[in-house]
Design a protein with these regions (language model features):
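Non-catalytic cap/lid and distal C-terminal segments of serine-dependent acyl enzymes
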Residues: 29-359
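Bacterial Sec-dependent N-terminal signal peptides
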Residues: 1-31
Length: 359
């Protein structure tokens, strides 16, 4: 009997068992959502009295607490009327970012990353992630202040090749346009059901909701319309055509009444046209070509027709400009295919983002 061989074999078995146990323990760990806040200079002293202290939900992967390594970062932007709780607040299993990230890491679908979810709602329901003379400089806050804050406080890989920006609806608009403007900060972008605003679909002067929005003289009248399109028109106007001298909305509306009909008001209307990503693509072609990866998608039964129409137009424009991108239509509406282990966030967005990070 070879006792030495038996002892060595026993040690190998023990070592293998130890390594297996360590691996299982590692995979059994979960990430965590931490709450944080940032005092923003870009959002201080606004006409609409927005809160300059912005709340954040931040997903830290399992390995964050267990190591000293640095991680790539995804900035994830919410839609109009929502906050970061769109992604972090649901307690239903696999209906929140933490559950999906933890599941994907264990399944080796993607690896660990930090996800930053800021609250960029405004008093009129949404910033559209743009600089506004009325609600504040949300583009500067997101792309400059917030990124610097996260890189300073958390163990990030602080370079564009390890940063992505994605979002849903209004957040999809923000993700695509901020990446378009700041390829030195973000290298990957993904817009889910992106609310690419255009004068198409519901956003036309023959829509009764548009007429109601144009006629509304105060917040009470606006909310009484009970129309997301009517309210949304004013929300977008605070982003695209703000006017600090015109209370109570502090906007130039893109339409005006001419008799009983709404017609374009040229100055404000043209500002909206210039803020349409289809038009922006021409101006930012060089920047778009610097991005490593661009993707956007939509449910072909989206309740908002302007989203369907303008996402298709945006893809055609990028194709015409020879800008590499992925555009996908799927069977679904504005929200019903986002969540769960069979949903778009888990199977498409998170995987796409991680696969395109600089390794």
């Amino acid at each position: 009997m070879n006792l030495t061989k038996i002892v060595n074999t026993s040690r190998k078995i023990q070592l293998s068992a130890f390594l297996l146990l360590t691996t299982l323990l590692c995979y059994s760990q979960t990430g965590q959502i931490v709450s944080d806040s940032i005092q923003s200079k870009s959002l201080a002293h606004t006409i609409t009295q927005e809160n300059p202290v912005r709340q954040l939900a931040i997903y830290l992967p399992p390995g964050y607490a267990a190591s000293t390594k640095r991680f790539p970062v995804l900035y994830l932007l919410h839609g109009i009327g929502d906050t970061y709780e769109e992604f972090s607040g649901d307690t239903i299993k696999n209906n929140n970012i933490k559950d999906l990230m933890d599941a994907g890491i264990v399944a080796n679908k993607f690896e660990e990353m930090i996800i930053v979810m800021p609250n960029e709602n405004t008093n009129l329901f949404g910033s559209f992630y743009t600089n506004s003379s009325v609600t504040g400089n949300w583009e500067d806050f997101t792309a400059l202040e917030l990124v610097d804050f996260i890189d300073t406080k958390y163990r990030t890989i602080a370079k564009a090749s390890s940063r992505a920006i994605a979002g849903h609806s209004m957040g999809g608009f923000g993700a695509l346009t901020l990446a378009m403007k700041h390829p030195d900060i973000f290298s990957v972008t993904y817009g889910m059901n992106a609310a690419l605003i255009c004068f198409c679909g519901e956003v036309t002067p023959n829509n009764p909701a548009i007429v109601k929005s144009v006629k509304a003289k105060n917040i009470g009248e606006l909310l009484a319309t009970q129309s997301s399109i009517a309210v949304g028109l004013l929300t977008v106007a605070q982003a695209f055509s703000p006017n600090p001298s015109k209370p109570p909305f502090y906007v130039d509306k893109p339409f005006k009444m001419q008799g009983t009909k709404a017609v374009p008001d040229p100055e404000a209307y043209n500002k909206w046209v210039a803020s349409n990503p289809v038009q922006m693509a021409e101006r930012y072609k060089a920047n778009l070509l610097k991005l490593k990866a661009i993707k956007f998608d939509l449910g072909n039964d989206d309740e908002y027709r302007f989203i369907t129409e303008n996402n298709r137009l945006f893809s055609r424009k990028l194709t015409m400009l020879k800008i590499p991108h992925q555009f996908e239509e799927y069977n679904g509406d504005h929200r019903n295919r986002l969540w769960g282990l069979d949903g778009r966030i888990y199977n498409d967005m998170l995987s796409f983002v991680y696969d395109n990070f600089g390794k």
